[in-house]
Amino acid sequence: MVMTKLYLGIDPGRSKTGLALVDGAGKIVKLHIAESQNIDNEIVEFTKNSCPVQIVLGNGTNSRNICEATQRVLPEVTVAVVEEASSLYRFRCSSPAL
């Protein structure tokens, strides 16, 4: 059986943090809105039956704390921090139906 590579995407926020498991083709496998104050446990529970090969973390609000939490609970997985500035604007421009 071939294991699908999964990536953990994290959109950090002050009170809520978005979590997404995405496969190598970009297909969303699982989504969750987590409580930022309990992010350690939320990440452990969210990834319980999966093994992400990389974490992609937005550099927005609270990203430093979220990054530290991911490194505590998934120390073997590398974290790539990505620029979030104007990301919603870029998304809306590329999706005219919105």
Which positions does each model-derived feature cover?
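Phosphate- and other anionic-substrate recognition elements at nucleic-acid/protein interfaces
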Residues: 2-8, 14-98
